[in-house]
Amino acid sequence: HAIRQRLAALADDAQKVKHQAILAFLQTQLGLQALTRSENKTAVSHFQSAIELDAGAVPAYLNLGDVQRREGQLDEAIATWEQVIRIAPERAYLVFDRIEAVTREQGDAERFPALCRRLIEANQQDWRARLALGRHLATRGQPSEALDLLFDSLVHNPHALSIHQVVWQALAALRFNEARVQRYMELTREAVFYLDPHVCMRCRYRSTELLWQCPQCHEWNTFVEERITPAEESEDDSS
């Protein structure tokens, strides 16, 4: 951490941004270490320092919100997590379960669905927001409405196993309605299921989960979600 600070101090403006981003990740790790010692105030200080270094330090927001929630600061926790949606909408799914759980604790049945709908309106290809809202509705006795969202989600990403799991939950609740099952079969006839793989842009290391540091090349924040495109499917079919 000290070495990285010295490098940041000596770097030009372009390199300083990169060094500060790495320092932010290191500050977040220090915060997590403080949490293992039950030093919440120290952890919060590290997470806040990370955000000051890099306003896009997603892990710092996630962990800061988690501490705020544990300390009973529910409104503050939600506000912190919502910053993730603002600064990195492609990572919004990381706060879905958190926000849904806290708003449920608060007795607010509208805030989370409204959030998902805003994200869907802002990005028509956001399959994760549709999945989150579909799962929310399915667990609250609205399987038909859930399936509409889940089928839309499948159109954008028919290969994600997480969608199919909730679809079957909703179909079971509808006693496997023939028309709905037929629609599901049409959408998934060519699908190959996988569990949300991620790949490091630096060294191509593959992971089934989002990692903040690559275990192979050790670079920070290099993982992106790998998607199977129609072109790739066509190439696979012809080979």
Ranges and model annotations:
Residues 55, 89-90, 124, 158:
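Short coil turns that delineate tetratricopeptide repeat
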Residues 18, 25, 59, 93-94, ...:
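Start-of-helix register in tetratricopeptide repeats
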Residues 4-7, 47, 81, 116, ...:
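Hydrophobic/aromatic packing residues within the alpha-helices of TPR/SEL1-like helical repeat arrays
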Residues 27, 34, 68, 102-103, ...:
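Residue at a conserved register position within TPR or TPR-like alpha-solenoid repeats
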Residues 8-20:
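Flexible helix-coil transition and linker loops at the boundaries of alpha-helical arrays
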